[in-house]
Structures are given as structure tokens and as C-alpha cells.
UniProtKB/Swiss-Prot annotation:
Gene from which the chain derives: Zbtb8b
Gene source species: Mus musculus (Mouse)
Name of the featured protein: Zinc finger and BTB domain-containing protein 8B
BTB domain segment(s): 24-92
Molecular function via GO: DNA binding; zinc ion binding
Keywords, sorted A to Z: DNA-binding, Metal-binding, Nucleus, Repeat, Transcription, Transcription regulation, Zinc, Zinc-finger
Amino acid sequence: MEAQSYCAKLLGELNEQRKRDFFCDCSIIVEGRIFKAHRNILFANSGYFRALLLHYIQDSGRHSTASLDIVTSDAFSTILDFLYSGKLDLCGENVIEVMSAASYLQMNEVVNFCKTYIRSSLDICRKMEKEAAVAAAMAAAAAAAAAAAHQIDSESPSSGLEGTSCGTKSFVSSPVDGEGSLDCTISSCDDCHPLELVAKDSQGSGVSDNDLCVVPRRVEPKVEFDVARVEVEADEQLQQYAAPLAHMEEGLPSNQALDLTYSSYHVKQFLEALLRNGAVQSKDDLDCHSSRGLEGRLEGPGVAMSSVMDVQNDWYREDAGDVLVVPIKLHRCPFCPYTAKQKGILKRHIRSHTGERPYPCETCGKRFTRQEHLRSHALSVHRSSRPIICKGCRRTFTSHLSQGLRRFGLCDSCTCVTDPQEEEDDLMPVNLSLVEASSESHEKSDTDDWPIYIESGEENDPTAEDSDDKPHIRPNLPAPETLT
């Protein structure tokens, strides 16, 4: 058996002990106010007090005192009453303070209660606002209806419907339709005003004239903006301008007729783009621009294109924020957001992603992504058609160079090549004075063939080498020979 009221009675007894300060073994000071409580209650409900009692209170037999600086006294009093009674006193003024205090004291149940209260309060406020808005709308509608009825009564004669002698026929309810629809036939009259008639169907049968409740009301014209209608009007205007242009072209020479056709096409293109972008001008503006363009065309063939440019400049000047976008086909990179106008530029850009180098050097095997890089490399590193001075022995070579000399600037003897036949073929020392003329002619031809030329001074200038390397290399080489 379980007693349902036992927990409530136990909490009531503990709350009475707290109020009378019976067996209270701890005190909490909040903003100068002292609150008496029991450790067991605080330990069981608050994670903050549980950690405080476990780690910081060593003397369990003495009276303990805790001080809270963040929590307000009113919020802590409300939370303490909830711990001993199970009832949380919340209102719109203290709900935020209580929720923040409960969050600091690690009391999740109180935090959830506060959140639920806030949601319900917001729902109630929204519901009240909706009801107030509906009531205000109904009051405004009633006031407007009363004002309209009063105005109609003051304007119309006392006879009611007889005053509006517009040839209005009787309204007959259709017995087939169960919704009380009316068939109204009104003769053409310029002085009558439209009336809104509300029919009340009595007992689902035929409707007599007495059963009709007539509520006259003046209907004001409603102005709506229809993009489709504006486009149709623009097309009609273009068609109207097309016929005069056709007659004008028949009486003009061929070149003038061609200019007029080209100009009318551009005007139509501008108008269509203007309508498509949403910046539709009024009918008067369109007539003004079109007439201005036609006047410019009638002046002569040389002024036709200038008139079109005038229309375009006027459009840009009036709508400075809108830009007429000309469709251009862009090539997109499949690896990144890069776009290019030419397919070759995109292909060269894709090589940076794939690592492709389609231009190899025939001499050293190095590969390049662009052909101009290969040409610059061949001119600056592999200069086989020009006299080169060996970095080791200082000999000048003009014939077919070996692989080592072309790549590293050293002759075969300096690169430890022992084949004498290759040395005789490759190494041909000549006098520098005899080679100057040929070198100048070679340089001129190179500059004509290769406009981009990069020369390294370290490979051609013998004075740029370090003097420390000469005694280590020259003892191992034969004596330099000179040609007379």
C-alpha cells in the first residue's frame, strides 16, 4: 500500500521546521539576508550545494554557513520555498531571475518549469494580440460599413432602389443551385453606380423581392500592376513602330534602311531587357524614348546609331543601380570557381590542378606548363648556338656542345669524360677576337627569333667566378692553347 499524501505531509513538516528554525543545520546568506535550511534538502535538490557539502564542509557536526553573491535574495527565497513545498511561485517579473538562479544552483527542474512558463506566457500574449487584432478589424469594418451606408442613404432618394433607374431587372434565384446564386442582368447605363447585393435564401425555396437584403456600396477602382499586361502593351507599341519603319525603309536607300533595321532591333532589345529585369517604365516613358529614337533616325543615316546610344545612355543614367547584362558564355573550371572567357585560358588553368606539363625540354628533360617558359629556359640554360666559356678551364666553345656543357656549363674534360675522340670533336678552342663577329650575328638572330631573352651573367662573365677555384682545377688540365 502506498499513501499518496505522505510526501506532501513530510514536506509540510520540514517547511514548518524551517520557518520555526527547528533542527536547521546550515545558513545561506544572500544579499545580507539569512536563510535557514537543512543540509539534506539542499544536498538532494541542488548540484551546487551537493558539491559544496562534499568538498568544502569537513566538520559535519558544526553549523555551516554559505554565502551566495550571484543569486538575488528574492529569487533564492522562491527557490527555497519550492524545495520545501513543491510549488514554484512564478510571475512575469521574477521568472528571469528565478531561472538564472536555478541555473547557477544546478537545479534543472526549476529551469524547465521557467522555460515552460515563458513559452506559455508568449503563447498567451500572441493569442491575446490576435484576438485584439481581429476585434479591431471587425470594429473598423463595422465603422466603414456604417459610414458607407450613411453616405448612400444621404445621396440616394427615399424610394431606395427606385431612385437608381438604370433599367435593373428583377433578381431571380436559381432553383437548381443550392447556394442561392443570383442571375443579374443590368442594362447599360453611364450614371448608375454598381451595387453589391446580398441574397438570403429562406427555407431553401424560391426567393422573393422582400427576402433580398440590398446593401448598396460604392466600389472604388482598384489599381493593380500587371507585368504581363505591360509586356503586351510594349509589344503592341513595338508593332506600331514597326509599320512606319517599314514604310520609311522602302523610300530610303539600302544603307539607310539597314541602319534603321539595326536601330529598331536594338531598341526592342533594350525594352525587352528592361521588362525582364523588373524595372518597367510607364507607358508615357516608353512613348517618350521611342519617339526620341525615331526622331533621331529620321535625321539621317549617320545619326541612327547615335540615337540608339542616346537611348541606352538615358536608360543607364535613370537606373544607375540596374545593369544591362549581355549574356557571355563562360568556361568554368571543374576543380574551383575560376571562370574564363576563352577555352585555351581555362585549359592552361586546369594544368595547375592536374599537374600536367606538356612541353618537355629536349636537352635536360625538364617539363613546363607553358611554351614561353620552355623558350626562356632554352635561351637562358641551353645556349648551344653561341660561344660558351667553360666554368672550369675557361675555354670557349662554338661547335656542337656536349650534354654536360649544355646543362652545367662545363666541358667534357672538366666533367671527367675520358673519351679522347669526343674531346677532339667537342672541344675546339678558338680565339675570342675571332668569335666576336660571329657571336654578334648569333645574338642578333636570337633576338629576332626569340623576343624574350634572359641572359645569366654568371655563365658568360669570366670575372664573376671565384678565384679560389682556379688553383684546384688548373693543375689537372692541359696548358691552354691559342690559335693564331
